């Protein structure tokens, strides 16, 4: 006789299998092409991931890639296994940065980038994006005692951001147009950005608010840091894939849309943004915004520019 926990696990597996079948059904009659044909032939799918983008895509103490993005990505991988008829499909995890993520997708090294990449119209010439799975805003992380409360307070100060990001572009534009005389440090990733901030080399860190919450969580004393500033942009996160590959994009979009339609994505959101997560077992306490709820109610891949 099944115990309640075993029954729940069985139900979850059945729901997941049904979702995969639903995502693959519209494509079942089509011969495989593009990325799916490549994956079937090689029996390998290459997944791009981040190393320190808590809680979306990062590496835990055991070396496993985890996070909200990765949980969704795992569902795509299951659908790819079903569509290609490769239950033993191998997964190759490839760490990516803000600088190399697009080239690695373009040149075929990475089949699907499951990180924290913003869907920008300007990027559509190089890559394609899936249905949006998260929406963030760009703000500042600073010490509670710094006196920084908004972007005008950064005049004459040193600020860190991540190289190759929307935040870097916006910060440099602001600096030039408003003659703020900021010194801007471009970090290669969130780990380097956090160290730059904590060491005092920068007075503030500009990035997406939810990622700044992750940086704060990783600090020795999270209560010493605060997220401030008028949002400078809204960022629609999507999985990145090669352009002109409608078959693969339809599969990825189908998996995400099914997760939203079934409500499964709400449970994943609760897991990663409202409950304790590794590595410190702290909760982000980051409730779902109305903008995100609207996206889940009507899934689409439109950028927010």
Give the ranges of each region predicted by the language model.
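Acidic, polar ligand-binding/catalytic clefts
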Residues: 74, 78, 85-153, 292-303
